[in-house]
Amino acid sequence: MILKDKKILITGILTDKSIAFATAKIAIENGATVVATGFGKGLRITERAVKRLSEDIKVFEMDIENLNQVNEAVKNIEDEVGNLDGILHAI
């Protein structure tokens, strides 16, 4: 398990055909804790998509173009899962 105890944020988990979904699946299979983000209508889609991967994935609201949302998401992620070891922005 090469990613054991690593925490990775993945954006863009919307469908099981996305690069983000495939990356999250591989990361989980290799021991990582995955957190995800979404915004607007995509937030609900992301919440549904991650359930197909794991019930343990936390989803945070974040639009990368909204600095206030980014700052809030960073704070919430740090509070709930600690420091991240990696980020994949796959939108």
Language-model segment annotations:
Residues E65-E80:
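Conserved Rossmann-fold cofactor-binding substructure of NAD(P)-dependent oxidoreductases
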Residues K41-E47:
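Short, charged/polar "capping" segments at the starts of alpha-helices
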Residues F21-A22, R48, E72:
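Generic recognition of short, well-ordered alpha-helical segments
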Residues V50-N68:
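Rossmann-fold cofactor-recognition segment
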Residues I2-K41:
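Canonical Rossmann dinucleotide-binding motif of NAD(H)/NADP(H)-dependent dehydrogenases/reductases
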Residues E61-M62, G82-I91:
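Rossmann-fold scaffold of SDR-type NAD(P)-dependent oxidoreductases
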Residues L9, V35, K58-F60, I87:
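Conserved Rossmann-like nucleotide-binding pocket used by diverse enzymes
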Residues A24-I28, K51-R52, N76:
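Short, solvent-exposed amphipathic alpha-helical segments in soluble enzyme
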